[in-house]
C-alpha cells in the first residue's frame, strides 16, 4: 500500500500551451501552483507567464473550471523565482521538446528542489533515462516521466514512465495523486520513443495517410470513414491533425523517424510531400484558419491533391460501406470489409490490419500488458475500443491468419512477422483473469494499488465484467441495488437516463424502500449522462392527444418525486457526471447533497423548449434565495444571481461553474475522477447517516420578492427584447419564470409555503405547454436535437 503523494504546492516549468494548461488543471483541483518561464525581455520579469495565464481564459475548450481561478496561479521566472521551488512537493517540467534545453534546466533547478519533492517531465517522447543523466544522485530516485494528453483538463490519460532508478513508492504516490486529485487514468509506459499513446496513435495516423494515397481517397472521405462510424471522435484523422497543428504533427513524425531507426516501419516515418507543402505555405491548421481543411464563408473546403487546390468537402462514406460498418457482429463486419472490392472498404481493412500488426509487434517493447495499449489509445485518442480489443472482438485467430496472409503476399506495410505469442492458440489478449503480458507470458490482473479500490466500476475492457450488485427493486424505469452494505443505489434504465412515468414512480418506491431497509440512497448512473431531463416525446404525445389533465398529473407527479427525494428520512445523494438537464438538475437540487464530477454540465434548460422548470426547480431557487437573504433581507438580490441562468437556459461548463450559476450549492462536492464518484457519494451518504441525518423541516415561511420583483425582472427583460437579445416568446417564458421565482403577484416580502410555489410552477408550465410555439420548440428539439428560437 502506498499513500498518495502529499502535494501542498506544485510548480510547472514552462508556460507554453501545455505547461499553462497543466498549471490550470492543478489549480482546478485545488493545488496551489507556481507557473515558471523565462524572464521577459521587456516589461515585468514575469511577463511571459502573465500573458500565458491571461490567455487561459481565451482557450476553447476552457482549461479552467472557472475563469476566476486564473488569479490563483502564481507567476514566476527562472532568474528571480527559483527560491519558490523549495516549498513545492511536485515539479512538472513542460518546456519545448529539446533534450539539451531540458537537461540545462534540470541542472539549474536541482539545488532548489526539496529533499522530498518529485520531479516529473511532461515530455511526449524523449528518453526519461537520458533526461535523468544530469540529475544529482539524491534526486534521481524521485524523477520520472508523466505525460499528459492535450487538453489536459479533458483527456483522461496520463502516461507514467519510470526511469531505471525511480523509487516504487514515489511512482505509487504520484499515481494515486494523478488518479484521485487530478482525475486521470494512469498507464505505465516503458521508456521508448513516444511511449504508448503517441507511438500507436501516430502510427495509426501515418498508416491512414499511406492508405489514403494507396487507395486514391480524399481527405474528407477518409475522415467520414475514420470517425464515429468506427467508434472514434468526429474529428477523425485529418481534422484532428488540423486541430493539433500540422507543424506539430510534422514534428512528432520527425521525432519517430529520428528516434526509431530500427523500426521495421521506419520508411513511413516521414512527412508526406503534401504536408510539407502546406506547412511551407503557412497553412498550419485550425490555429491559422487553414490547413487540410479551411472554412470559406459557411462552406468547408478541403485540399485536393490532384488539383493542388481546395475543393468543397463533400465526399462521404459510400452507402455499401456504411452498410458493412452497421453490421453488429465484428467478425462478420471485418470479413466483409476484407472481401469487398470497394476502395473505401479496402482502405479500412488495410488500416486496421497494419494497426493490429504494429501493435502486436511492438507490445513487448512499449508496455507491460495489452491493457496498457488499449486504455492509452482509448483515453488519449478518444477511441471507443483499443486496437487489441477491436482485433479480439473480430475473432483473434481468424484476423491473425488474415494478417499473416497479407504479410506473406506483400500487402502489409511491413514484412516483419507477427510475434509467436499471437499464434499460441489464444482467443485474445483480454479476459476475466487479466490482460496478456509478453514479458511474463501470462495474463496479469489490474493494479492492486489502494487508490483503485475507490473505483467500483472501472472503465471496462472487452471481456471484463464487474458484479452488478444485488437487485432490490426494478421496474421499466429504474433499478435499485446494493453491495451487501447499508447504502442503496438507484440507476435509470431509459435512453439518455431521461425521466419517464416509470422513473418517477420507481424513484418514489425506491425512496420508501431505502427509508425502511437502508441508511442512505445514491442516485447514480452506470454511464453518462446523469439525466437529459424529462421524456419530451411522451409529454408531447399527451399534449397532441389533448390529454391536458393527464399532462398536469405528470407534472404533479414530477414535483411529488422531487419532494419525496428532499424529505426522505434517509440522505439521498445525487452522483452527477455529464449532462444533468431539466428534471435531472431538479432531482440533484432536491438531494441532501450532490457529488458532481468536474465534467458535469448542469442546467435548467426548459426555456429552450418553450417551458419552465416545473419539477420543483423554480420553487427550490425561491427557497434558497429566502434562506440566503435571511429574515427581512433582500430576496431579489439573491434571485438575480440565478434568474438569468434559468431564463437563458444556461448550462454550466463544469461543476465549479455550476456553483457560480447557483445550480449547485457551496456545500456540494466536486469530484475529479468520475470513476470514483459512486464511492464518494456512498461515503457522503454514510457520513450523513452516521451524523444522525434528519430531513429539513418543511419550508412554510418562504420570503418572496413578490410583485415588485416581477416588475423589476420584466424591466430587465424589456431591455433585452428591445436590444434583440431575446424573441417575444422568450420574453413571455422568462416573465413567467420571474412570476414563479418571485412567488406570484403578492406583496414584496410576503411569506408563502412550498405548495404555493409548486402550484405556480404547475400553472405556468401547463399553460406554456399548450401554446403552439412551445409545441413547435419541443418538436424541433426532438427532431434536430437543437433549440428553436421562435
Predicted regions and their residues:
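N-terminal glycine-rich phosphate-binding loop for ADP-containing cofactors
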Residues: 2-521, 525-528, 535-559, 563-570, ...
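Short alpha-helical segment that forms part of, or immediately flanks, the ligand-binding pocket
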Residues: 586
Amino acid at each position: 500500500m502506498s499513500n498518495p503523494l502529499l502535494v501542498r504546492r506544485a510548480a510547472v516549468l514552462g508556460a507554453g500551451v501545455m505547461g499553462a494548461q497543466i498549471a490550470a488543471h492543478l489549480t482546478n483541483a485545488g493545488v496551489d501552483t507556481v507557473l515558471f518561464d523565462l524572464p521577459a525581455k521587456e516589461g515585468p520579469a514575469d511577463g511571459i507567464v502573465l500573458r500565458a495565464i491571461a490567455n487561459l481564459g481565451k482557450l476553447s475548450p476552457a482549461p479552467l473550471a472557472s475563469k476566476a481561478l486564473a488569479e490563483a496561479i502564481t507567476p514566476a521566472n527562472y532568474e528571480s523565482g527559483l527560491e519558490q521551488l523549495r516549498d513545492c512537493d511536485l515539479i512538472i517540467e513542460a518546456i519545448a521538446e529539446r533534450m539539451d534545453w531540458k537537461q540545462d534546466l534540470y541542472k539549474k533547478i536541482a539545488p532548489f528542489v526539496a529533499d522530498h519533492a518529485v520531479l516529473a517531465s511532461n515530455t511526449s517522447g524523449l528518453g526519461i533515462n537520458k533526461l535523468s543523466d544530469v540529475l544529482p544522485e539524491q534526486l534521481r530516485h524521485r524523477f520520472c516521466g508523466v505525460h499528459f494528453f492535450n487538453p489536459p483538463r479533458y483527456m483522461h490519460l496520463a502516461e507514467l514512465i519510470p526511469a531505471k532508478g525511480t523509487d516504487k513508492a514515489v511512482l505509487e504516490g504520484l499515481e494515486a495523486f494523478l488518479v484521485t486529485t487530478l482525475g486521470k487514468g494512469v498507464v505505465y509506459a516503458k521508456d521508448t520513443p513516444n511511449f504508448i499513446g503517441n507511438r500507436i496513435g501516430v502510427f495509426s495516423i501515418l498508416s491512414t495517410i499511406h492508405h489514403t494515397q494507396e487507395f486514391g481517397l480524399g481527405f474528407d472521405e477518409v475522415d467520414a470513414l475514420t470517425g464515429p462510424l468506427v467508434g472514434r471522435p468526429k474529428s477523425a484523422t485529418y481534422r484532428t491533425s488540423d486541430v493539433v497543428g500540422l507543424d506539430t504533427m510534422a514534428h512528432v513524425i520527425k521525432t519517430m523517424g529520428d528516434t526509431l531507426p530500427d523500426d521495421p516501419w521506419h520508411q513511413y516515418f516521414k512527412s508526406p510531400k503534401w504536408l510539407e507543402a502546406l506547412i511551407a505555405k503557412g497553412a498550419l491548421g485550425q490555429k491559422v484558419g487553414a490547413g487540410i481543411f479551411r472554412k470559406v464563408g459557411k462552406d468547408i473546403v478541403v485540399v485536393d491533391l490532384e488539383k493542388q487546390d481546395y475543393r468543397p468537402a463533400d465526399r462521404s462514406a459510400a452507402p455499401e460501406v456504411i452498410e458493412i460498418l452497421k453490421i453488429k457482429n465484428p467478425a462478420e463486419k471485418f470479413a466483409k470489409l476484407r472481401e469487398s472490392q470497394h476502395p473505401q472498404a479496402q482502405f479500412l481493412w488495410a488500416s486496421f490490419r497494419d494497426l493490429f500488426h504494429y501493435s502486436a509487434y511492438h507490445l513487448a517493447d512499449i508496455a507491460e500488458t495489452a491493457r496498457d495499449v488499449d486504455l492509452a489509445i482509448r483515453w488519449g485518442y478518444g477511441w471507443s475500443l483499443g486496437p487489441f480489443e477491436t482485433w479480439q472482438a473480430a475473432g483473434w485467430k481468424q484476423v491473425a491468419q488474415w494478417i499473416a496472409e497479407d504479410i506473406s503476399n506483400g500487402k502489409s506495410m511491413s514484412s516483419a512477422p507477427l510475434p509467436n505469442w499471437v499464434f499460441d492458440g489464444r482467443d485474445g489478449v483480454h479476459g476475466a483473469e487479466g490482460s496478456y503480458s509478453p514479458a511474463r507470458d501470462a495474463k496479469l490482473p489490474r493494479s492492486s494499488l489502494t487508490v483503485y479500490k475507490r473505483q467500483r466500476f472501472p472503465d471496462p475492457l472487452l471481456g471484463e465484467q464487474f458484479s452488478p450488485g444485488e437487485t432490490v427493486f426494478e421496474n421499466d424505469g429504474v433499478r435499485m441495488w446494493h453491495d451487501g452494505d447499508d447504502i442503496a443505489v438507484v440507476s435509470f434504465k431509459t435512453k439518455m437516463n431521461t425521466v419517464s412515468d416509470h422513473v418517477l414512480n420507481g424513484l418514489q418506491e425506491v425512496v420508501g424502500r431505502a427509508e425502511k431497509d437502508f441508511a442512505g440512497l445514491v442516485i447514480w448512473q452506470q454511464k453518462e449522462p446523469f439525466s437529459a431531463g424529462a421524456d419530451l416525446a411522451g409529454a408531447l404525445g399527451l399534449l397532441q392527444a389533448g390529454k391536458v389533465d393527464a399532462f398536469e398529473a405528470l407534472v404533479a407527479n414530477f414535483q411529488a418525486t422531487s419532494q419525496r427525494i428532499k424529505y426522505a428520512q434517509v440522505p439521498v445523494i445525487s452522483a452527477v457526471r455529464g449532462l444533468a438537464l431539466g428534471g435531472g438538475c431538479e432531482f440533484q437540487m432536491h438531494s441532501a447533497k450532490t457529488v458532481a464530477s468536474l465534467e458535469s454540465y448542469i442546467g435548467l434548460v426548459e426555456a429552450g423548449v418553450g417551458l419552465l422548470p416545473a419539477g420543483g426547480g423554480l420553487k427550490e431557487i425561491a427557497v434558497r434565495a429566502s434562506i440566503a437573504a435571511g429574515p427581512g433581507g433582500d430576496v431579489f438580490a439573491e434571485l438575480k444571481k440565478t434568474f438569468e441562468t434559468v431564463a437563458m437556459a444556461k448550462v454550466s461548463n463544469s461543476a465549479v461553474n455550476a456553483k457560480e450559476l447557483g445550480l449547485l450549492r457551496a456545500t456540494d462536492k466536486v469530484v475529479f475522477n468520475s470513476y470514483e464518484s459512486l464511492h464518494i457519494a456512498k461515503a457522503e451518504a454514510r457520513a450523513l447517516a452516521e451524523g444522525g441525518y434528519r430531513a429539513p423541516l418543511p419550508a412554510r415561511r418562504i420570503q418572496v420578492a413578490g410583485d415588485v420583483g416581477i416588475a423589476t425582472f420584466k424591466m430587465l427583460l424589456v431591455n433585452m427584447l428591445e436590444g434583440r437579445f431575446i424573441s417575444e416568446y422568450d420574453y413571455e417564458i422568462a416573465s413567467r419564470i420571474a412570476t414563479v421565482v418571485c412567488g406570484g403577484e403578492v406583496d414584496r416580502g410576503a411569506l408563502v409555503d412550498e405548495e404555493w410555489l409548486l402550484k405556480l410552477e404547475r400553472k405556468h408550465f401547463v399553460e406554456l405547454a399548450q401554446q403552439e410555439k412551445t409545441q413547435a420548440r419541443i418538436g424541433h428539439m426532438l427532431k434536430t436535437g437543437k433549440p428553436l428560437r421562435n
